[in-house]
Amino acid sequence: MKRLNTLVLYISFLILIISIVAGCGTGKEAEIKKSFEKTLSMYPIKNLEDLYDKEGYRDDEFDKNDKGTWTISSEMAIQKKGEALNIKGMVLKLNRNTRSAKGFYYVNAIKKDENGRPQDKQIEYPVKMIDNKIIPTKDIKDEKIKKEIENFKFFAQYGNFKDLTKYKGGDISYNPEAPIYSAKYQLTNDDYNVKQLRKRYDIPTNKAPKLLLKGSGNLDGSSIGYKKIEFTFVEKKGENTYFTANLHFKPSNDE
């Protein structure tokens, strides 16, 4: 009987520990979602010039007269089996002090040389934004590139995370020392954002992606940090397909 009671106590204790750990994981997942909602609730930002009037979190790094700068980026990377990793994307900085935006569109093809070292061949095309339109600041002879810039849309302009709270069972990671945190979810091809990506990019796989929400800074938003979104369709040696997007607020550099 003693042995049975001891076993029952041990099992009860084990169940309690598992419940506490699971509860902590669920609580941290909710905190991470809440942290991202502060940024993702702005999506879709159809007119990027609206960011000139949106305030982000300010800490003591900001000068009192600095209204801050929003940096927005989107990038698609595709590597078919045995080929180079082809990357196309854009970065745009929207300065709230000057109400002006400039950045660059870029293309890159990364392949390894005979010694296995990656060779980076990124080409950048400077751009600016006027009346919510992206315009090259230098003459571009390549008509295909010109068209890509003309038609480019940032993920923040069409992405929608109104159903973020419905994502369940995420793989949660949290390091309070850094602090950095992330939540990863397996999506389906019926997900709204997945459909939008397939509509805009020639994605060479029917596999549904995993969504990674990765951030830095205090979870309660009381510090400056980044918020990164990544959709990974394929991830293996010599073959990759992923999309990344970012939107963050930081002090301006008006030099």
Swiss-Prot record:
Membrane topology, from the record: Lipid-anchor
A GO cellular component annotation in the UniProt record: plasma membrane
Oxidoreductase is among the record's keywords: no
Signal sequence bounds: 1-23
Subcellular location, principal: membrane
Keywords of this entry: Cell membrane, Lipoprotein, Membrane, Palmitate, Signal
Membrane listed as a keyword: yes
Residues carrying lipid (N-palmitoyl cysteine): C24
Database matches in InterPro entries: Csa, Csa_sf
PROSITE patterns: PROKAR_LIPOPROTEIN
Entry's localization field: Cell membrane
Family label: Belongs to the staphylococcal tandem lipoprotein family.
Protein name (Swiss-Prot/TrEMBL): Uncharacterized lipoprotein SA0094
UniProt source species: Staphylococcus aureus (strain N315)
